[in-house]
Amino acid sequence: MTATEAKNRKINVGDGDDVVDIEIPDTAHQISSDSWFQVAFVLTTGINSAYVLGYSGTIMVPLGWIGGVVGLLIATAISLYANTLIAKLHEFGGRRHIRYRDLAGFIYGRKAYHLTWGLQYVNLFMINCGFIILAGSALKAVYVLFRDDHTMKLPHFIAIAGLICAIFAIGIPHLSALGVWLGVSTFLSLIYIVVAIVLSVRDGVKTPSRDYEIQGSSLSKLFTITGAAANLVFAFNTGMLPEIQATVRQPVVKNMMKALYFQFTAGVLPMYAVTFIGYWAYGSSTSTYLLNSVNGPLWVKALANVSAILQSVISLHIFASPTYEYMDTKYGIKGNPFAIKNLLFRIMARGGYIAVSTLISALLPFLGDFMSLTGAVSTFPLTFILANHMYYKAKNNKLNAMQKLWHWLNVVFFSLMSVAAAIAAVRLIAVDSKNFHVFADL
């Protein structure tokens, strides 16, 4: 279905006696056009983004072997479960909920619509700031491989990364238009993951003695472990599942479930490999950006870093797409996306959004802290608290007493985790802000 066809119309869904009318809300972007496999690649691109190069340092170092391995496995299972709850509600009430806020508003009312949009916007904004920091850090890593004059600092590279992201955003009108870029993204992911694994194994074999002890005082350990728990859920969740599900063809629930099963089985294996092997090789000294820890030929490290830069640009576009869709729909962008009028609009709107994101990224370039805070204030509420309560609310009459209790236990537990992780993340940012000035060259 093209953008111009998606105008609050109804379509028939189902076979035989099960045919129902499903209302399609207004949107300027293309929906219902992608196969489940393409959607699976969108999800896998997110889970194996350049963020995976940070998990050895931001998850395994604070949690250690037992906590890290068990935590990742549990986070995988509960994230799959929470995402399936959201996916099953996509056509709840005879309407396709192509935005997270639409679903929340339909179930709870107008206030929940605005609250969910606010949470989601913060979630995606911080994720995108993280991608710009990642791309800038990778760009700096390439620079210092060949020049060690320190003339250019991290904020300069973050600015360059932001410019690249803006150019890409202007050229790709909507999520479905990524097309071949998803294949490019997968190829780029394989490059930096394989390089990181091979060089880590080589370093690990050469350096048999490593320290895996969790560092710091009892109080600092408590805060870093809590922050790492937020990183665990951040690793697996997009916070924009309905927006991604909107692009999949009918039957949307069945096809989305296929995509989710792919993401949480085959899709997580590269992430597991680079996370565990990186920590095995360097122990508690693992950098929050793994390619800064590895040793090897300059050209190989440069190739991996360039791949991380380009993949971050593609990933950012995925996570920024709900914001772009909102702007395009609100201001009535119609017709050929490459018409001069539409190009100028994207230059102003998307360029402005990325400019603000780039400024914040350069101002506070603490990647691990961004991941912890994002997981705490938005991933926990959106993916776990809201998903369980929405499902409970929507399916209340069909749930038995034990199922209702189960969903309420999830709501309470993840609410407590969200508060604790937010406190830990704010403390981490406060500590780093004391140790480093704004626009720091990390």
From Swiss-Prot:
The chain crosses the membrane at residues 35-55, 58-78, 124-144, 157-177, 178-198, 222-242, 260-280, 302-322, 351-371, 372-392, 411-431. Proline transporter that mediates proline and glycine betaine transport. May be involved in long-distance transport of proline and required for phloem loading, retrieval of proline leaking from the phloem, or in xylem-to-phloem transfer. When expressed in a heterologous system (yeast), imports D- and L-proline, glycine betaine and GABA across the plasma membrane. Has the same affinity for D- and L-proline. It is found in: Cell membrane. InterPro entries: AA_transpt_TM (IPR013057). GO terms for molecular function: L-proline transmembrane transporter activity. Belongs to the amino acid/polyamine transporter 2 family. Amino acid/auxin permease (AAAP) (TC 2.A.18.3) subfamily. It comes from Arabidopsis thaliana (Mouse-ear cress). This is Proline transporter 1. It comes from the Eukaryota. Expressed in vascular tissues of roots, leaves, stems, sepals, petals, stamen and siliques. Expressed in pollen.
